[in-house]
Amino acid sequence: MRCLTTPMLLRALAQAARAGPPCGRSLHSSAVAATYKYVNMQEPEMDMKSVTDRAARTLLLTELFRGLGMTLSYLFREPATINYPFEKGPLSPRFRGEHALRRYPSGEERCIACKLCEAICPAQAITIEAEPRADGSRRTTRYDIDMTKCIYCGFCQEACPVDAIVEGPNFEFSTETHEELLYNKEKLLNNGDKWEAEIAANIQADYLYR
């Protein structure tokens, strides 16, 4: 590397200042870049075998056919996807899907009209009306959920002291009209009757963490 004396360096700096920085880079940065040492930079081998191999890969498209071969090999492997809706993957016991109201084995409704679910719902999607029973307890006369407001946070299920309102395993409940997503008490109880066995098993599997 050529050694620059002080007068030569000053002259070079003056010429660079008059001509402006080359390609937008200062003389100092160019001088620093010239001292960079590239680590692990490999020069291509120029012997006959290496040159022949590179020419063969280029002319015969060996890399292309190797990639195509790898793609074709996946036709004979087990697929990583499933054929939905004919096949469905497993669901977690904590999955939060369509809502349901549960009953006791005797058929009596679990809900005690405490309205904790209505109070805790951040989306204000639950509306409850209740009346007293002859024995002094309370029963719901109206239990509505606006499913278009629900954010499926699961707070209603966590707040319920008797596991009455739950989010079931069903996630396929799309509708053609808005009105069909306004669930009333009868709809929620029917959901609970339909999925009671699965809901009870999921709650039992998760009881240690509740």
Curated annotation (Swiss-Prot):
Chief location category: mitochondrion
Cofactor: [4Fe-4S] cluster
Subunit structure: Core subunit of respiratory chain NADH dehydrogenase (Complex I) which is composed of 45 different subunits. This is a component of the iron-sulfur (IP) fragment of the enzyme. Interacts with RAB5IF.
Pfam families xref list: Fer4_7
Native source species: Pongo abelii
EC top class named in words: translocase
One of the protein's GO biological processes: mitochondrial electron transport, NADH to ubiquinone
Alphabetized HAMAP family for the sequence: NDH1_NuoI (MF_01351)
Domain 4Fe-4S ferredoxin-type: 102-131, 141-170
Transit peptide interval: 1-34
GO cellular component: mitochondrial inner membrane; mitochondrion; respiratory chain complex I
EC identifiers of the protein: 7.1.1.2
Gene Ontology molecular function, alphabetical: 4 iron, 4 sulfur cluster binding; metal ion binding; NADH dehydrogenase (ubiquinone) activity
InterPro entries reported for this sequence: 4Fe4S_Fe-S-bd (IPR017896), 4Fe4S_Fe_S_CS (IPR017900), NADH_quinone_OxRdtase_chainI (IPR010226)
Binding site for [4Fe-4S] cluster 1: 111, 114, 117, 160
Primary gene name: NDUFS8
Residue numbers binding [4Fe-4S] cluster 2: 121, 150, 153, 156
PANTHER family tied to this protein: NADH DEHYDROGENASE [UBIQUINONE] IRON-SULFUR PROTEIN 8, MITOCHONDRIAL (PTHR10849:SF20), NADH DEHYDROGENASE UBIQUINONE IRON-SULFUR PROTEIN 8, MITOCHONDRIAL (PTHR10849)
Cofactor binding: number and manner: Binds 2 [4Fe-4S] cluster.
Its biological purpose: Core subunit of the mitochondrial membrane respiratory chain NADH dehydrogenase (Complex I) which catalyzes electron transfer from NADH through the respiratory chain, using ubiquinone as an electron acceptor. Essential for the catalytic activity and assembly of complex I.
Name of this chain's protein: NADH dehydrogenase [ubiquinone] iron-sulfur protein 8, mitochondrial
Top-level taxonomic group: Eukaryota
UniProt record similarity statement: Belongs to the complex I 23 kDa subunit family.
Coiled coil (UniProt feature): none
